[in-house]
Amino acid sequence: MIPRKHRPHARTLRVATVQFESQPGDKESNFATLEAFVRKAAYQGARLVVFPECCITGYWFLRNLTRKQLAGLAEPIPDGPSTRRLQALAQQHDITIGAGWVEAGRAGVFHNSYVVALPDGRLHRHRKLHAFEHPAIEGGAEFTVLDLPEGWRAGVLICYDCNLIENVRLTALQGAEILIAPHQTGGCRTRNPHLMGVIDRRIWERRREDPGAIRRELRGEKGRAWLMRWLPSRAHDNGLFLVFSNGVGVDDDEIRTGNAMVLDPYGRVLKETSRAGDAMVVTDLDAGLLPDSTGQVWMRARRPELYAPLAVPTGREQSVRKLKFSE
């Protein structure tokens, strides 16, 4: 683990997390939404604002695109227009911004990527480790942990990356005090009969006439209740803050459930939104909660010499794409 005490560190950090309904393929509209939220976050004194997975390009419709269509939507990083705009926005408003889109990599390879733009002009990119959205989108092969200007250390894991406990632990062991966790989740098709499942689009379309019905879906087993089965444990067991951002509303043939929230190192929800629409929450992180959090204590009791079998294939591993689309 990287010792935190050796790095200059602000005692508190104000963060913002956003949920919004991305428009498929409409990067201009989606960036305009992002820019409006950045202005609001900066006005409220946030030093970090987190946006959802693939919020610039759109998400679930990607699986139906041809390779040519995907290539027309994807952009290189750091030389593409969305990267440059995000970088300029971070510098203009003196705030760190995280946002996602489809990256055009080398040799015709694509990635589900997330860029963190710092106000000093620096950039960090995370490629989703467990990507499944399109046959041409390949998973990344590196963990991403970075230093924020305020001295805090943050890691990035995209959606399915957070499902695997090993990924969060490895991020924590690299010194992450904050996990930036952009998602497009909730309301998903699944073979599990006890959680998730598709939300009837008519309920979403009638959300103003019947707000109680959509609230029950977003907060129930297809949304927040499912998140509460596992998301707090990622923060608690690894002694870190978790900034969860998500899509909300129509995402091709599914309905995303929002519930943008921030959790502390004890797995407690510091602030969240239950709004059935675009929304942002802002809260302060207290570094004083980190050193004696249960997860930090547990990690100091690790016995690494016992854990070599974790890196040995069992023969039961499958591609995440096969697992996802066999559901």
Predicted regions and their residues:
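N-terminal glycine-/serine-/threonine-rich phosphate-binding loop
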Residues: 1-48
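CN hydrolase (nitrilase-like) catalytic-core segments centered on the catalytic cysteine
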Residues: 78-98, 153, 162-279
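Short, glycine-anchored, charge-dense loop/turn motifs used at functional sites
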Residues: 112, 116-123, 263-270
